[in-house]
Amino acid sequence: MNNIFYLSNISSFSNNTVLESIISECNNLTLKEGLVGHEDKSAEIRKSQIGFFEDKNIPLNKLMYDIATEVNEEHFGFDINNTQNIQYSVYKESDLGKYDWHIDTNFLNNNFIQRKLSIVLQLSDPADYEGGQLELDVNDYGVDWGDFQQYANQKGSLIVFPSFIRHRVTPVTKGIRHCIQEFIIGDTFV
């Protein structure tokens, strides 16, 4: 693994027309309370509304998978072969929306597939909310996340990181934060 994360502002995503089109599609999704590991113990750890794009054949899925594949080849070298459905997340001030420290993979499951890469696409302008900061726990890897904090939370920013990296979204104290996540999967880590 050459890097701990990949961070970019994809030109097509930073175009407001493209982002507004994605947000419009997200607004048609049915939202439900986000869970932690398919269990209803989320109030302490997670407070967000989520919806899923059930059709994996949408252009956004292909675009994000293509980006992840390229980033994986250049930086991580994981065995990846598919995606899970794109997840749309909403963190609201009225809920103190957050997702406390967690990882996106489960090393203890009995499945033959595992989340390998996590992708977050920021849909909100940082002026539209306070708090709600995406933070990666990368200090043990010799990286100061503070150097990347502001950039990672810009509208249109896209970050790809190994699903085993601890991360969180801090509580939203004003406004609403919107983002998309996609998980790239592959055979279990050996």
Feature annotation, model-predicted:
Residues 1-87, 96-98:
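Non-heme Fe(II)/2-oxoglutarate
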Residues 73-190:
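Catalytic core of non-heme Fe(II) oxygenases with the double-stranded beta-helix
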